[in-house]
């Protein structure tokens, strides 16, 4: 009994300090050129991974020491992953963000992947305000919003690719699409009628994640801004 009493009254051993794990930021990274540019920037400011994601078929690569995990997704799906909380943050074009009406925080315009949303038509096209405009596009919501803003009624024809073909074959009067250099338009006998939305890649965050991981996100944003500014100065 006394031995047991001594054991119970003995001082407890010191609690071993546990290493606190770094909070992981889950990043939805678009596959392709834009994703490569963004990854190179992030890797340059301490968010790289030991594994080269371009040299693997894996869709998830991570670096726990840096507190970073990348999900490699289709550009059109980035906003979905972030909005629904599968990813904390992501990089997505303003076109996709606007078309999806994603309920996310838009934290930074990276200035990468610059282009513009345009109305384009055959070189000899003349607008007739008295008739319905047939518009071919994959950006249905953006097209409807633009034409509503100028008070025009339209007939939308949703296409998923080769949009330039629609007016050539008489399927539509005009198209609404992204234009970067205009080369594809010119080669197909089309011209820009109106430019109405500048587009570039935006850094977005899930609203709930931002409440819990704002410190990590703000730190990444600060470093990313500095890297983008340094990149701009080199031009």
Predicted regions and their residues:
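Domain-level signature for soluble enzymes in the chorismate/prephenate branch of the shikimate pathway
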Residues: 1-235
């Amino acid at each position: 009994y006394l031995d047991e009493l001594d054991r119970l009254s003995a001082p407890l051993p010191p609690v071993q300090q546990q290493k606190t794990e770094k909070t992981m930021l889950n990043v939805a990274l678009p596959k392709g050129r834009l994703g490569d540019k963004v990854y190179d920037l992030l890797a340059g400011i301490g968010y790289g991974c030991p594994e080269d994601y371009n040299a693997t078929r894996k869709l998830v690569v991570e670096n726990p020491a840096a507190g970073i995990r990348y999900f490699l997704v289709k550009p059109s799906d980035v906003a979905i992953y972030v909005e629904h909380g599968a990813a904390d943050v992501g990089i997505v074009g303003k076109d996709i963000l606007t078309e999806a009406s994603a309920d996310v925080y838009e934290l930074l315009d990276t200035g990468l992947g610059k282009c513009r949303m345009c109305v384009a038509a055959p070189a000899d096209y003349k607008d007739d305000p008295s008739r319905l405009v047939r518009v071919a596009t994959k950006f249905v919501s953006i097209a409807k919003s633009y034409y509503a803003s100028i008070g025009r009624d339209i007939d939308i024809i949703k296409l998923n690719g080769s949009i330039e073909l629609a007016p050539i074959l008489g399927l539509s009067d005009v198209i609404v699409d992204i234009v970067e250099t205009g080369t594809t338009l010119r080669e197909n006998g089309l011209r820009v009628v109106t430019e109405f939305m500048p587009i570039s890649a935006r850094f977005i965050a899930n609203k709930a994640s931002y409440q819990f991981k704002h410190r990590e996100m703000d730190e990444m944003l600060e470093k990313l801004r500095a890297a983008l500014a340094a990149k701009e100065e080199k031009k």
